[in-house]
C-alpha cells in the first residue's frame, strides 16, 4: 500500500475512533460528577451524545463541576496523551492519530470561548454546558472566556 493511501486510511480511522471516544469522555465527565453527587445514571448514549440521570444532591459548586466536567475530562485525557507522545514512532497511523486525537478532544473547548460572548448578548443557547456553568457558578462570562482561551492556548503549545 502506498504512503498516500495509508495516510488517508489512517486519517479516516483516526476520526472514526476519536469522535466516539470524545463523546464517551465528555458524557463520562458529566456522569462522574453526577455519580459523585449520589445520582443514578439512567441513560448514556454515544450515538445521541447525551447522558441522563435521576436524583443526586447538587450544590452550586458540584453543579458547576457537572457542567464543566464534560469539557475538562477530554482535555485532561488529551493533555496526558500529549505528554506520553513518542516522537520516535514511525507509524503513519500513530502520527496522524496523535495529531487528531488532542485536536478533536480540545477543540470543543472553543465553545467555552464563544458561548460567554453569546451569554453577554442574551443569546446563549439554553441547556448548554457553558450557559449552565455560568449560571450555576455565578462566574463572569469574561472570566469563562479568558479561562477557555488560556486553556486552549496552553494545549496548543504543550
Indicate where each model-derived feature is located.
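Short, Lys/Arg-rich, polar N-terminal cytosolic tail immediately upstream
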Residues: 1-5
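Small-residue-rich helix-interface/hinge motifs
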Residues: 7, 14-64
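Metalloprotease/metallohydrolase-associated module, dominated by Zn2+-dependent proteases
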Residues: 44, 52-158
Amino acid at each position: 500500500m502506498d504512503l498516500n493511501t495509508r495516510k488517508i486510511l489512517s486519517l479516516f480511522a483516526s476520526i472514526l475512533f476519536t469522535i466516539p471516544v470524545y463523546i464517551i469522555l465528555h458524557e463520562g465527565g458529566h456522569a462522574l460528577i453526577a455519580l459523585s453527587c449520589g445520582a443514578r445514571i439512567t441513560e448514556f448514549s454515544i450515538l445521541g451524545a447525551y447522558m441522563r440521570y435521576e436524583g443526586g444532591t447538587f450544590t452550586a459548586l458540584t453543579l458547576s463541576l457537572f457542567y464543566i466536567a464534560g469539557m475538562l475530562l477530554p482535555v485532561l485525557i488529551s493533555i496526558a496523551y500529549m505528554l506520553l507522545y513518542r516522537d520516535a514512532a514511525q507509524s503513519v497511523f500513530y502520527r496522524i492519530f496523535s495529531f487528531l486525537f488532542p485536536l478533536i478532544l480540545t477543540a470543543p473547548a472553543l465553545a467555552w470561548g464563544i458561548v460567554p460572548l453569546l451569554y453577554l448578548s442574551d443569546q446563549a443557547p439554553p441547556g448548554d454546558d457553558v450557559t449552565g456553568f455560568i449560571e450555576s457558578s455565578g462566574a463572569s462570562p469574561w472570566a469563562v472566556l479568558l479561562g477557555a482561551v488560556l486553556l486552549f492556548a496552553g494545549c496548543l503549545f504543550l
